[in-house]
């Protein structure tokens, strides 16, 4: 049996600012995973945890367009990205739009680890390891505070 772990690399103060509580972390840790796991299953489970903890699901960017981010709580945007790199970069544009319109000032972006990518037997996704390196190029282009978080999988002990 395996479990999901959200690695955040943030101090407790910063976690509180983006509403990632110890309860959310323990609920993610409690998700049981078998040897068969696909990225859509992982994404659904993570969204469910955040939704149960007061994040509103599917934040629509504009009433005339069918564009969404995963969720929002107060002025913190949430994107759970378990897909291709292009989807991640499109999420950045959507978050920037929300920030430009005063709807968010911070964002959490959850990305799978290379380890989780391998476990799910997939490839060419926006892994935390890849994206965190690439984002060093864009430090000064964001109009909101972004926190990348790494979703990993470990054997349950």
Question: Model-flagged regions — what are they?
Answer:
Residues 114-157:
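Domain-level recognition of nuclease-like catalytic cores that cleave nucleotide substrates
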Residues 1-63:
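Acidic-basic catalytic patches of nuclease active cores, encompassing PD-(D/E)XK
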Residues 57, 105, 146:
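Hydrophobic anchor at the start of a short beta-strand
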Residues 103-113:
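Conserved beta-strand signature within the Rossmann-like core of class I S-adenosyl-L-methionine
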Residues 77-90, 114-116, 120:
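Short beta-strand-loop-alpha-helix junction that forms the active-site gateway
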Residues 98-104, 137-142:
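Arginine/glycine-rich "motif VI" loop of SF2 helicases in the C-terminal RecA-like domain
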Residues 35-74, 84-93, 97-100, 155-156:
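Active-site metal-binding core of divalent-cation-utilizing nuclease and nuclease-like domains
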């Amino acid at each position: 049996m395996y479990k999901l772990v959200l690695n955040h690399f943030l101090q407790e103060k910063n976690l509180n600012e983006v509403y990632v509580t110890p309860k959310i972390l323990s609920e993610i840790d409690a998700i049981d995973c078998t040897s068969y796991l696909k990225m859509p299953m992982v994404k659904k489970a993570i969204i469910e945890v955040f939704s149960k903890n007061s994040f509103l699901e599917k934040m629509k960017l504009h009433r005339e367009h069918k564009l969404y981010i995963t969720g929002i709580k107060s002025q913190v945007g949430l994107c759970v990205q378990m897909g291709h790199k292009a989807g991640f970069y499109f999420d950045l544009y959507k978050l920037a739009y929300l920030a430009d319109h005063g709807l968010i000032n911070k964002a959490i972006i959850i990305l799978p680890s290379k380890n989780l990518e391998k476990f799910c037997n997939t490839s060419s996704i926006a892994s935390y390891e890849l994206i965190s390196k690439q984002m060093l190029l864009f430090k000064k282009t964001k109009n909101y505070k972004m926190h990348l978080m790494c979703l990993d999988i470990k054997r349950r002990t």
